[in-house]
Amino acid sequence: MTRWSMSMHCTLFLLFLLRLTCIFSDSDYLMGLGSYDITGPAADVNMMGYANMEQVASGVHFRLRARAFIVAEPYKKRIAFVNLDAGMASQLVTIKVIERLKQRYGELYTEENVAISGTHTHAGPGGYLQYILYLVTSLGFVHQSFNALVDGIEQSIIQAHENLRPGSILINKGELLDAGVNRSPSAYLNNPAHERSKYEYDVDKEMTLVKFVDDQWGPVARIMEDWFERENGCRSVDVESPRRVSSIISDPYDQDLMEMASSLLSTGGKTVTRMSSVARRVRSRFRHADKPRFVSAFCQTNCGDVSPNVLGAFCIDTGLPCEFNQSTCGGKNEQCYGRGPGYPDEFESTRIIGERQFKKAADLFTKASEEIQGKVDYRHAYVDFSQLEVTINGQNGGSEVVKTCPAAMGFGFAAGTTDGPGAFDFKQGDDQGNPFWRLVRNLLKNPTEEQVRCQRPKPILLDTGEMKQPYDWAPSILPVQILRIGQLVILCVPGEFTTMAGRRLRDAVKTVLKEGSNGREFSVVIAGLTNSYSQYIATFEEYQVQRYEGASTLYGPHTLSGYIQEFKKLANDLLSAQTTDPGPQPPDLLHKQISLLTPVVADMTPIGTAFGDVTSDVPRLSKFRKGADIVRVQFRSANPRNDLMTEGTFALVERWLEGRETWVPVYDDDDFCLRFKWSRPFKLSTQSTATIEWRIPETASPGVYRITHFGSAKTPISSIHHFSGSSSAFVVY
């Protein structure tokens, strides 16, 4: 997300293997899958995650996708879960997707049984949320980003709906170590000692995998879901220039490691070959006609305080560990950065953590044996968190009623985290603020005394909940949702819960479910960043410390208690088959959106040259060694915003197929080894360059290859036209 939501990726992992034709059986469940490209604009658009004005998209490392999974009881209820390669879900995106689904399917898919959950990548285009706070660095609303998401989610659900197949479901759990650490341990230690003593670690280590077995294909046709409770990486930092974060879509340390593990699990560690039709801009995997289709996804859970930088946080100027309580170096936060397992190579860190996930998921999949049985059901409500009355346990026994507050950001949020520090003189753990920044704040909105008291001890830096011009700066009304598949219960939350906050929520819901079902045990997991976005949810005790997560807990110290109260209501309604009060509707602010992003005016090349021309080729008769060398080629290009190449590719590696005397596609935008980078000499230049880098994998087959670039140009006197260009041939050995 943005610097106010800088956490990394924990994982919810879903893996579906299905055949596309429908058959009938006596299975308890029908299951469908879909996957569609949501990459969006690969140039000029600020990325959603760091609130860094310099992090502007300029290429593609991995294409982003929406992955839809539908589970239904035959002729009864169904749920649809969509995993989104995006920083978070957007309330506006959810509203528009549901509108489209209702137009197509009536009341079959609604906000009650559809969950849209972000992976929390910090390397995807921004500008698709509807509240001003999340649109500042993207220069307002970006229609291309928004439309790519809405279109892709809709198409993925359509695919899943049209490919329902019968099957059974298994579940398995296991411990995964050395993949995440708590980045705010001083805040975690403020939780009660007796509570902390119940857990061995200060982050959750359990991976839950759900394996779906297709009735016709048996164990070969499988579907897996995995909630991995930790965060998976958040940044790509240049070692020599640590303030520069990646501008390549889905670059490390975000969805890359998820895609890395997903791809490894999809292929058993072998190369995946894809075919691509430029004319139709459609990509599909090579597969035998009688084999099931495969889709995998990693999603977020309660990882608000979890980091993949498992080596710890260090000062880049001295090499010493950062100060413990405020994560500073010499009193400043800018020099304090976490280190991943492959330090200083962030791509290597991506590979290492992805491989660790893959190995654990593969082991759990192989050994899964417990069958999921029971009904499919769901409950959903909208809650106004700006003024929610919450009943909590009183200090002297009994109970008392407290209230949440309108949204506000504390000084500590501007300090960032060890995964992406902030700027100026902000520090984590600041419960006082300073006069200068209070003066700056008051120019925007001076919080009322009631708001100051309600948010205490948070010193308010941005009073977003009370800022309404030109329209709302932050959400007030949020969705809460429970999805049930037998004994598996998914808590869909519109934000990032810290480790202990998530534990409390899960335990509270488990207690309600167990007491209301004669002691039956349920597997309860959290799907974070779902359906909307409201930043962080820390415990009451963590809130007092005001590190990044507490300072970014919008609705005051009782935010978590509010969530627990509302989810207990949903759980009771679920068990008792009671109808849930839908609550107040969130606003649809599409008509109020403002965009300051300039359109593409024209693309040009120097006189005597053409789009697609190679400007830096491979050496003549060159040879490259697989597993060691990098092939780099440059082309005259045009702005990637002219055509998003949805379900297509900007970059392609082709291999000469002896015997057939033709070039065949091998690697494209979706492959870890291939990178498409776009640049221009200065911001308003009409000339641009595409650089394609192929890090030849060890698994590449020896042979003759070439690199091809596809693009679209907009000239001053004509409409957009497509072009392509290819490098000279070279040998890989």
Swiss-Prot record:
One of its GO terms (biological process) is cellular response to oxidative stress. Residues 1-25 form the signal peptide. It is an enzyme of class 3 (hydrolase). GO terms for molecular function: N-acylsphingosine amidohydrolase activity. The keyword Chloroplast does not apply. The active site is at S307. It is found in: Secreted; Endoplasmic reticulum; Golgi apparatus. InterPro entries: Ceramidase_alk, NCDase_C_sf, NEUT/ALK_ceramidase_C, NEUT/ALK_ceramidase_N. Disruption phenotype: Increased sensitivity to C2-ceramide induced cell death. It catalyses: an N-acylsphing-4-enine + H2O = sphing-4-enine + a fatty acid. The keyword Glycoprotein applies. Its EC number is 3.5.1.23. Pfam families: Ceramidase_alk (PF04734), Ceramidse_alk_C (PF17048). Glycans are attached at N325. It comes from the Eukaryota. Keywords: Endoplasmic reticulum, Glycoprotein, Golgi apparatus, Hydrolase, Lipid metabolism, Secreted, Signal, Sphingolipid metabolism. Hydrolyzes the sphingolipid ceramide into sphingosine and free fatty acid. Promotes oxidative stress resistance. Belongs to the neutral ceramidase family. This is Neutral ceramidase 3. It comes from Arabidopsis thaliana (Mouse-ear cress).
